[in-house]
Amino acid sequence: MSQQKGKKSRINVEIYGQQYSVVGDESTSHIRMVAAIVDDKMRELNAKNPSLDTSRLAVLTAVNVIHDYIKLKEEHEKLKESMTKKGME
């Protein structure tokens, strides 16, 4: 849920042991949730690839997250098509 137009949220978050100041249109709770997911994903991938440096780990995390996003987007499109064919939309 977006905040009022033009109103930005600023929050400090910790991702993989580093502090970041994040500014966005979403609520602070949304930004915290996004940061927590990124942190969790980085830690999950680090457990599987402990020799990766932080930069490579960050890129691998981005690749994995975008992969998940694309898969969900494709599933969403298939569901929309299915609903349209059944006259549910």
Curated annotation (Swiss-Prot):
GO CC list: cell division site; cell septum; cytosol; plasma membrane
UniProt GO BP: division septum assembly; FtsZ-dependent cytokinesis; septin ring assembly
InterPro entries (alphabetical): Bac_CellDiv_Activator (IPR053712), Cell_div_ZapA-like (IPR007838), Cell_div_ZapA-like_sf (IPR036192), Cell_div_ZapA_firmicutes (IPR023688)
Subcellular location: Cytoplasm
Domain of life: Bacteria
Keyword Cell division: yes
Pfam families: ZapA
Major subcellular location class: cytoplasm
Keywords: Cell cycle, Cell division, Cytoplasm, Septation
Entry annotated with the keyword Metal-binding: no
PANTHER family, per the entry: CELL DIVISION PROTEIN ZAPA (PTHR34981:SF1)
Family annotation (HAMAP family): ZapA_type2
Function field: Activator of cell division through the inhibition of FtsZ GTPase activity, therefore promoting FtsZ assembly into bundles of protofilaments necessary for the formation of the division Z ring. It is recruited early at mid-cell but it is not essential for cell division.
Family the entry assigns: Belongs to the ZapA family. Type 2 subfamily.
Subunit annotation: Homodimer. Interacts with FtsZ.
Protein name: Cell division protein ZapA
Species of the source: Bacillus cereus (strain ATCC 14579 / DSM 31 / CCUG 7414 / JCM 2152 / NBRC 15305 / NCIMB 9373 / NCTC 2599 / NRRL B-3711)
